[in-house]
Structure formats: C-alpha cells, structure tokens
C-alpha cells in the first residue's frame, strides 16, 4: 500500500541538467497536493524558477582543490550549508528528501541523513554522478532517465518517467517555427556554449542558398551576447530568433527539423521526447558525461550524429547539417527515436518512490 506523502524537500543546484528534473518533480508533486521545498544553491536568479516556488539558498562547497585557502573556504561553506540545511529540514519536517546530483546537493543530503529522513535520488546521465553514487548506499531508491545506468547503484534503481515542461501545440512559438522549412534549433546548454555560439551561426549562413526558407531558433545561454550572434544571422540573411533562455523549448523542439546541441541529460531527454534528429556536440568537461550521452544517442537511439568539440569546424558542421536535413535520413532518425520511446518506462517517479517507502 502506498504511503501518504505530505511534504518533500528537493536538494538541487548546479546546471540545468540537475535543476530542470527537480522542477519537473516539483510540479508533479504539487499537482498531487504535496508541499515541496527546494533547497540548494544558485537558483535564486535562475530563469526556470518561477514565482511562488518555495526555495531556500543553502551554501555549498567541494573541498577537492590543491589550494589550501580554497580548501578551507569550501570546507567552511559546506559546514555552513550543512547546518543551515539541518535547520531548514527541522522547520519544514519533510517525509522524504530527494537529491538530483551535483555537489550543491551535498549539504542537504547530509542534513537529511542526520535527521533520519528517507532519502531518494534521481540520476539524469548515463554516467552516474559522484554524489549520487556515494549516497546510493543510504538511499531507499534512485530513479534514472536511462536504464543502462541502474547497474551502478547500491539501492533499488529503476527508469522512471518525469513529466515534461509545459507546452502547447497551438502556441505562437510553434506556429512561427512551423511556417518555415527547415527549422533548426540550436541549444548551447543552461550555461551557454561559446564555441556553439560562434561556429554554428557561421556554418548555417553558408547554407542559406540551399535552404532559403530556413529558420534558426538559437538559445545562447544567459551569459552570452545575444546581439553578437543575431548579427551573424542577420548579415547572412537567415531568419532567426536568438534568445538567452527559452521557456517554451518543447514547443520549439516539436516544430524543429533538426537540433544542434550540447549533450546534457536534460536536452537529450527532451530531444528524445520530441523525436527530433540531432547533431550533438558534447561538452568535453564534466568527466566525459556528455560524450557518453552523445554516443548513446548516436549508437543506441540512432537519432543523429556526434561531433567532438576538438573536431568541430564550420565545414564539418555544414556537411553534417546537410546530411541530417536530407528527408530520407531525417525520417529514418525520427522513426528510430519513436521506436525507442515506445519501449520506455511509463512509471512515474512519484509511483516508484511510493513503492520503495
């Protein structure tokens, strides 16, 4: 019998790959009448964090650097975060704590264990994060985006379904995208990607003669220069919309013929959900997580191609885009993504948690 859940605390922070799933879980739990509190770092000004969401900033730090001053500073931040998280959890009194990876969740997870609150985790990537691996020995269960990663954890692990961000098939954004062919969506990730913002526009303007009705929806990231990227498209006479962040990303993906993107877990999940072929350019850091994600997308999902950042050139990108926009290739990749999607779990994270309690 499923246990009644009244309150849930979410340990969040870091990049969009950790934050977006947490917000999705928050929305799903709120619809069930469950009170949700977000605890973490770096969300105060995050564009995804809407008004009315209960959030408390928790200091965090990872003392794994050689500089002794930084070690001391980060250790103090971690201790401060742990004490504040203990206080917030005592006041909120949740029935469980859910961690979404990244070291920003560390103080909250430690505080949750100290209060003996049941712990759950969510892993977005195909390579398990270190925090999730560490805490899996204490967790009641962990939900994952992709089933191959379940073997890496010491607790019950299962692929779960997370509701996607809101979208509308009749939205103005969707209509704008579908009025042009081809529509290409460029996503640099939640932190932006300078090399994508530089190389991709230069490559796409070279294709304007082949695709005169091409429309590009380019999300540069919150720290990037929108006007600089837009100038390249305008100079090349490419119809475009350049934005730092896109709240209606699913609308754009559903209307797109191709997406050019980093290979973070969240965008990979949304590309798969929208069944849109992709050219993935994985971020070379983050312990190689994105390259593993991209290889899975190419080799298992057969949904597109991968270009390593060190191999990225305008010429190569033009070749890959031309290949991807071929109607036969595009249809084949869409069908592959659709076939894989039909095999995926439909069990919600909420249902999985209730089974494990």
Curated annotation (Swiss-Prot):
List of residues binding UDP-N-acetyl-alpha-D-glucosamine: 15-17, 125, 190, 290
EC number in record: 2.4.1.227
Topology of the protein relative to the lipid bilayer: Peripheral membrane protein
Domain of life of the organism encoding this protein: Bacteria
Name of the top EC class for this enzyme: transferase
GO CC annotation: plasma membrane
Swiss-Prot/TrEMBL catalytic activity: di-trans,octa-cis-undecaprenyl diphospho-N-acetyl-alpha-D-muramoyl-L-alanyl-D-glutamyl-meso-2,6-diaminopimeloyl-D-alanyl-D-alanine + UDP-N-acetyl-alpha-D-glucosamine = di-trans,octa-cis-undecaprenyl diphospho-[N-acetyl-alpha-D-glucosaminyl-(1->4)]-N-acetyl-alpha-D-muramoyl-L-alanyl-D-glutamyl-meso-2,6-diaminopimeloyl-D-alanyl-D-alanine + UDP + H(+)
GO biological process: carbohydrate metabolic process; cell division; cell wall organization; lipid glycosylation; peptidoglycan biosynthetic process; regulation of cell shape
Pathway: Cell wall biogenesis; peptidoglycan biosynthesis
Family, as annotated: Belongs to the glycosyltransferase 28 family. MurG subfamily.
HAMAP family (UniProt xref): MurG
Full protein name: UDP-N-acetylglucosamine--N-acetylmuramyl-(pentapeptide) pyrophosphoryl-undecaprenol N-acetylglucosamine transferase
Organism: Chlamydia pneumoniae
Organism phylogeny: Bacteria, Pseudomonadati, Chlamydiota, Chlamydiia, Chlamydiales
